[in-house]
């Protein structure tokens, strides 16, 4: 059995080596000729999987190690009887921790002592948005949820959701929707001229969902105005050919890596491995946890005199500080458009190991229950 797999999916040999022969490929440039004799295709979000790629091939199962599926023509796969699986929620914790780190930096930038005084509007409350909401609420943030499809589908919970206009009134607006172009609530360019005009200079806009959810040209125009909001982008229109003018205008810019924790990537591999085993009728014998290495940083300590918010934010940034990825991206965005695109992909391919907060043991000496609860809300392991 031949498995053609994106070379950037981790632990391919560990999970799939005893199922079939593995052929590693560049997912961005994958061609029909490279998959014509494959039985299994494993991809990430950079590969468009449709009739053009797979017609006439032997492929009978497609797995994407991502939460998003807008790069997969699921209707065509179903018509052809080709099995399919994604990895919903695999990196939800990673993205939520990314947003929390951004919030900690934003509070510092604005001189806000109590970061939980910020109101946060979450647009898109699926696996990622839901995980973020749970963390924020445990940290005593005021959170407003906007998800029209869920609001309509879940009548018993309809009152928990607010319209987009109300979410846009929050101090922080963070986007976590899938990319959809049809239906009653398409998200393609959902945030455009009028929505951006509603955001002022005392607000923060974060996009760690899909680049095309924001109209890039409208955003660039808005950022050239004196009263523009502060903007953080992890995802971009037209990746990997991102707009360098937009890059220059945003506060923090990262190369689509919010979900790139080691745990998140390994869970993505594990989920498509499990789905393939079910498809083939094989027993599931492996779990991501058995392959996790010891973290480079395993412990931090705080005394009883530590300020609660400051201690939590120090530990959070010890695990992940987005300023490092921002600096790397800006340094590589030189040269012609093709060179910049290659640099963007290279940053993602060669991304350094990043661990989630659950990998870090926090020692608290003489601490209050309040600070213990705050650390637990984010997933840290406590030693009291």
UniProtKB/Swiss-Prot annotation:
Protein location: Cytoplasm
BP term (GO), one: pyridoxine biosynthetic process
Chain sites annotated for binding substrate: 45, 66, 260
Positions bound to NAD(+): 147, 177, 234, 259
Catalyzed chemical reaction(s): 4-phospho-D-erythronate + NAD(+) = (R)-3-hydroxy-2-oxo-4-phosphooxybutanoate + NADH + H(+)
Active site: 210, 239, 256 (proton donor)
Predominant localisation class: cytoplasm
GO molecular function: 4-phosphoerythronate dehydrogenase activity; NAD binding; protein dimerization activity
Enzyme class: oxidoreductase
Keyword hit for Acetylation: no
Alphabetical UniProt keywords: Cytoplasm, NAD, Oxidoreductase, Pyridoxine biosynthesis
Superkingdom of the source species: Bacteria
EC number: 1.1.1.290
Any one cellular-component term (Gene Ontology): cytosol
Cited PROSITE patterns: D_2_HYDROXYACID_DH_1
Annotated metabolic or biological route of this protein: Cofactor biosynthesis; pyridoxine 5'-phosphate biosynthesis; pyridoxine 5'-phosphate from D-erythrose 4-phosphate: step 2/5
UniProt xrefs under Pfam families: 2-Hacid_dh, 2-Hacid_dh_C, DUF3410
Main function: Catalyzes the oxidation of erythronate-4-phosphate to 3-hydroxy-2-oxo-4-phosphonooxybutanoate.
Summary of subunit composition and partner proteins: Homodimer.
Similarity remark: Belongs to the D-isomer specific 2-hydroxyacid dehydrogenase family. PdxB subfamily.
HAMAP family in alphabetical order: PdxB
Protein name as catalogued: Erythronate-4-phosphate dehydrogenase
Species per Swiss-Prot/TrEMBL record: Marinobacter nauticus (strain ATCC 700491 / DSM 11845 / VT8) (Marinobacter aquaeolei)
Lineage: Bacteria, Pseudomonadati, Pseudomonadota, Gammaproteobacteria, Pseudomonadales
């Amino acid at each position: 059995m031949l498995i053609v797999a994106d070379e950037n999916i981790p632990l391919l040999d560990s999970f799939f080596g005893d199922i079939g022969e593995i052929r590693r490929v560049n997912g961005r440039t994958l061609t029909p000729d490279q998959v014509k004799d494959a039985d299994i295709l494993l991809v990430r979000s950079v590969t468009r999987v449709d009739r053009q790629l797979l017609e006439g091939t032997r492929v009978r199962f497609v797995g994407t190690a991502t939460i998003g599926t807008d790069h997969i023509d699921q209707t065509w796969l179903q018509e052809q009887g080709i099995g399919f699986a994604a990895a919903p929620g695999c990196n939800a914790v990673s993205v939520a921790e990314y947003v929390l780190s951004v919030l900690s930096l934003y509070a510092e930038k604005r001189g806000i002592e109590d970061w939980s005084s910020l109101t946060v509007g979450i647009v898109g409350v699926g696996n990622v948005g839901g995980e973020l909401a749970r963390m924020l609420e445990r940290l005593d943030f005021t959170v407003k949820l906007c998800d029209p499809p869920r609001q309509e589908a879940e009548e018993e919970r309809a009152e928990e959701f607010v319209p987009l206009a109300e979410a846009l009134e929050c101090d922080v607006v963070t986007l976590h929707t899938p990319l959809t172009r049809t239906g009653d609530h398409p998200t393609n360019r959902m945030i455009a001229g009028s929505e951006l005009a509603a955001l002022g200079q005392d607000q923060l806009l974060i996009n760690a969902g899909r680049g095309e959810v924001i109209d890039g040209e409208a955003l660039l125009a808005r950022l050239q105005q004196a009263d523009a909001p502060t903007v953080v982008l992890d995802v971009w229109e037209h990746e990997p050919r991102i707009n360098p003018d937009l890059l220059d205008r945003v506060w923090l810019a990262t190369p689509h890596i919010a979900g790139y924790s080691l745990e998140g990537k390994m869970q993505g591999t594990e989920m498509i491995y499990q789905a393939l085993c079910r498809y083939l009728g094989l027993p599931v014998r492996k779990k991501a946890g058995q392959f996790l290495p010891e973290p480079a940083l395993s412990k931090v300590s705080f005394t009883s005199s530590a300020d609660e918010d400051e201690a939590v934010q120090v530990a959070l940034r010890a695990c992940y500080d987005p300023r490092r990825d921002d600096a790397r991206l800006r340094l590589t965005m030189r040269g012609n458009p093709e060179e910049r695109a290659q640099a963007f992909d290279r940053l993602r391919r060669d991304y350094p190991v990043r661990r989630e907060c659950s990998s870090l043991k926090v020692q608290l000496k003489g601490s209050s229950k309040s600070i213990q609860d705050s650390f637990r809300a984010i997933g840290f392991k406590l030693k009291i």
